[in-house]
C-alpha cells in the first residue's frame, strides 16, 4: 500500500526502516550521513584534493554525481546494450577543480564505476547504502528547485507556469524510492502521471502485455502516492477515479490538471528535508564527529547546527554576486525553494530576495566556460534562528480548507497566513465542469471559494534560538502581509533542461 508512507516518518523512509523509535531513527539517519562523509573523505584522497578544494561545492557535486551514476543500474544496463561513440559505459567522471599557481584549473577525471562502488560500499560498512544515495539525489533536486523555474515542463503538459510552487522534486530520478516520493510536490506527481497517460494515448501497446501490466502497477502506485498528498476527501475521491480508470485518457488528464490547480489553495502535504552537500558531511566526519553515535535528523536543528560551523566555498563567475550565490545554496540546503520569502528571511536573518533579482546563475559550471576569470568565495550558509521542517501544506482546518497561495509551499513549521491571489486562481476554474467528477469538482471549487487568505491558515510552532535545542520556546514572528512572498514569480529564472 502506497499510503503506508504516511505512517512512517521521513527518516524511516530515508533508511528503509521498519517502525523505529526516535533514538533508533536518529541513529540510522546519522549512520547514513556518516557514510556519505566517509565516502567523501576517501574520494578527496583519491583525487588528491587539498582541504580548500575538498570544500568546493562544485567538486562535491561532481563526486556526488559520480557515485549516483555508478549505482544507476538501469542506465548502466542501457549503456551497455546501446553503446554510444566515445562513451565508456563502465566509467564515470566529471570536472574537478584545483588551484594551480593562484588560478582555478578544470581537470576532467574518469574512474571505473566498479571502483567508485567499492569505495562507497567500504565507507558504508559493505552495504549498498541506498538511503545515502537517495539523500544525495534529494540534495541535487533541492538545488535544481532553487535554481530553475520549470515553466517549460509545465506548459508542455498543459499546466499553468504559475503552478511552479507545486513542482518540488521535479528533477528527482524515478529510482529515488519512498524518501524521494515523499518530497515530490503535487505538480510533479501530476506531471509524471500526465506523461504516462499521453504515452498510453500515442502507443497502443503501452498498457498491454506483460510490460503493460507492470506499467499499470506503476501507474496505480503513482496515483496512490499523489492521493496520499491530498488532504481533503473530495480531492482523494477524484484520485480514486483517476486510478481506477480502465483506459486512462484525456478525461484523466483533465481531472489531474484540475486537481493540480486545486492544490494551489487546498495545498497537498509535501515533505521537506535538509539535505546538505557531501562536502559538508566529509569535513565534519574528518574532525571526529560521530553522526551515528550523536544521532541526526533531517527535519530538526541538526542541519542548521552543521551549517553554522561549516566552511563551504564556491566558484564565482565574473558578474555574479557571491551573496546571491550564498542565498541560492542556503535555500537549497534548507529545501526552501517554495517557502514564503518573509519566513525564510526571518530565519536566515538576512533578506532573502526573489530568483529574478539574484545576480547568479546555477552552481554548476559548464565545460565550455572560461576558467581564467573564475574566482572562489565563501558561501554564507548560517542562519539567525532554526525551525522545524514541515510536511503540511497548511490548509485543512476541520475539513474546511483555508488559504494557500499561488506560489508557496511551506517548508518551515512557522505560523503565518498564506497570502494568495484568489481571483487569479479561481479564474482558472471557469469552464469545464461536466463529466463524471462534476460533483467532486463542485465540492472542491466550493471549498476553494470559501478559503479566506486573511485567516492564519498555517498553524506552526515558530522559530527557535540556537540555544533552544529542545524547541521549548517558540518565537512566532509577525509578518507584514502587504508584500507577498514568493520566490519565483513574474520571473526570469533560467529553465531546467535535462
From Swiss-Prot:
Assigned GO CC terms: helical viral capsid; host cell; host cell nucleus; ribonucleoprotein complex; viral nucleocapsid
Compositional bias segments (type: Basic and acidic residues): 8-21
Region (Disordered): 1-21
BP term (GO), one: symbiont entry into host cell
Keyword annotations: Capsid protein, Helical capsid protein, Host nucleus, Host-virus interaction, Ribonucleoprotein, RNA-binding, Viral nucleoprotein, Viral penetration into host nucleus, Virion, Virus entry into host cell
Main location: virion
Motif (Unconventional nuclear localization signal): 1-18
Subcellular location: Virion; Host nucleus
Any GO molecular function: structural molecule activity
Motif (Bipartite nuclear localization signal): 198-216
Post-translational modification: Late in virus-infected cells, may be cleaved from a 56-kDa protein to a 53-kDa protein by a cellular caspase. This cleavage might be a marker for the onset of apoptosis in infected cells or have a specific function in virus host interaction.
Function recorded in the entry: Encapsidates the negative strand viral RNA, protecting it from nucleases. The encapsidated genomic RNA is termed the ribonucleoprotein (RNP) and serves as template for transcription and replication. The RNP needs to be localized in the host nucleus to start an infectious cycle, but is too large to diffuse through the nuclear pore complex. NP comprises at least 2 nuclear localization signals that are responsible for the active RNP import into the nucleus through cellular importin alpha/beta pathway.
Subunit and interaction comment: Homomultimerizes to form the nucleocapsid. May bind host exportin-1/XPO1. Binds to viral genomic RNA. Protein-RNA contacts are mediated by a combination of electrostatic interactions between positively charged residues and the phosphate backbone and planar interactions between aromatic side chains and bases.
Family per record: Belongs to the influenza viruses nucleoprotein family.
Name used for this protein in its record: Nucleoprotein
Gene for this chain: NP
Amino acid at each position: 500500500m502506497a499510503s503506508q508512507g504516511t505512517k512512517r516518518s521521513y527518516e524511516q523512509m530515508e533508511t528503509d526502516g521498519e517502525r523505529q523509535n526516535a533514538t533508533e531513527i536518529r541513529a540510522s539517519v546519522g549512520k547514513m550521513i556518516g557514510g556519505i562523509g566517509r565516502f567523501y573523505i576517501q574520494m578527496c584522497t583519491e583525487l588528491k584534493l587539498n582541504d580548500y578544494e575538498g570544500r568546493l561545492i562544485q567538486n562535491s557535486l561532481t563526486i556526488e554525481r559520480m557515485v549516483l551514476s555508478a549505482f544507476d543500474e538501469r542506465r548502466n544496463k542501457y549503456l551497455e546494450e546501446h553503446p554510444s561513440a566515445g562513451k565508456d559505459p563502465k566509467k564515470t567522471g566529471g570536472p574537478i577543480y584545483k588551484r594551480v599557481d593562484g588560478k582555478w584549473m578544470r581537470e576532467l577525471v574518469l574512474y571505473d564505476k566498479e571502483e567508485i562502488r567499492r569505495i562507497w560500499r567500504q565507507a558504508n560498512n559493505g552495504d549498498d547504502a541506498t538511503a545515502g544515495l537517495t539523500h544525495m539525489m534529494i540534495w541535487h533536486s533541492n538545488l535544481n528547485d532553487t535554481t530553475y523555474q520549470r515553466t517549460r515542463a509545465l506548459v508542455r503538459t498543459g499546466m499553468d507556469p504559475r503552478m511552479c510552487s507545486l513542482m518540488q522534486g521535479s528533477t528527482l530520478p524515478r529510482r529515488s524510492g519512498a524518501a524521494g516520493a515523499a518530497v515530490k510536490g503535487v505538480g510533479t506527481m501530476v506531471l509524471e502521471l500526465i506523461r504516462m497517460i499521453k504515452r498510453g494515448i500515442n502507443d497502443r501497446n503501452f498498457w498491454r502485455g506483460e510490460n503493460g501490466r507492470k506499467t499499470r502497477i506503476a501507474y496505480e502506485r503513482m496515483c496512490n502516492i499523489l492521493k496520499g498528498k491530498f488532504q481533503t476527501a473530495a480531492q482523494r475521491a477524484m484520485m480514486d477515479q483517476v486510478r481506477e480508470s480502465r483506459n486512462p485518457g484525456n478525461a484523466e488528464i483533465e481531472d489531474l490538471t484540475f486537481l493540480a490547480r486545486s492544490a494551489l489553495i487546498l495545498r497537498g502535504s509535501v515533505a521537506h528535508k535538509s539535505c546538505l552537500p557531501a562536502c559538508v558531511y566529509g569535513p565534519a566526519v574528518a574532525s571526529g564527529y560521530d553522526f551515528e553515535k550523536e544521532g541526526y535528523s533531517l527535519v530538526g536543528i541538526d542541519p542548521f547546527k552543521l551549517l553554522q560551523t561549516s566552511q563551504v566555498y564556491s566558484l564565482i563567475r565574473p558578474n555574479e554576486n557571491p551573496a546571491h550565490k550564498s542565498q541560492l545554496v542556503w535555500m537549497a540546503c534548507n529545501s526552501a525553494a517554495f517557502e514564503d520569502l518573509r519566513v525564510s528571511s526571518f530565519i536566515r536573518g538576512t533578506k532573502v530576495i526573489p530568483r529574478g533579482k539574484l545576480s547568479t546563475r546555477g552552481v554548476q559550471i559548464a565545460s565550455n566556460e572560461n576558467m581564467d576569470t573564475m574566482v572562489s568565495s565563501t558561501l554564507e550558509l548560517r542562519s539567525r534562528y532554526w525551525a522545524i521542517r514541515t510536511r503540511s501544506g497548511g490548509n485543512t482546518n476541520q475539513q474546511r480548507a483555508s488559504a494557500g497561495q499561488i506560489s508557496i509551499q511551506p517548508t518551515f513549521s512557522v505560523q503565518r497566513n498564506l497570502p494568495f491571489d484568489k481571483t487569479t486562481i479561481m479564474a482558472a476554474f471557469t469552464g469545464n465542469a461536466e463529466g463524471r467528477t462534476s460533483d467532486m469538482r463542485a465540492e472542491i471549487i466550493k471549498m476553494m471559494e470559501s478559503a479566506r487568505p486573511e485567516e492564519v491558515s498555517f498553524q506552526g510552532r515558530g522559530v527557535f534560538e540556537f540555544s533552544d535545542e529542545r524547541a521549548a520556546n517558540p518565537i512566532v514572528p509577525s509578518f507584514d502581509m502587504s508584500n507577498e512572498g514568493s520566490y519565483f514569480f513574474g520571473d526570469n529564472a533560467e529553465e531546467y533542461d535535462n
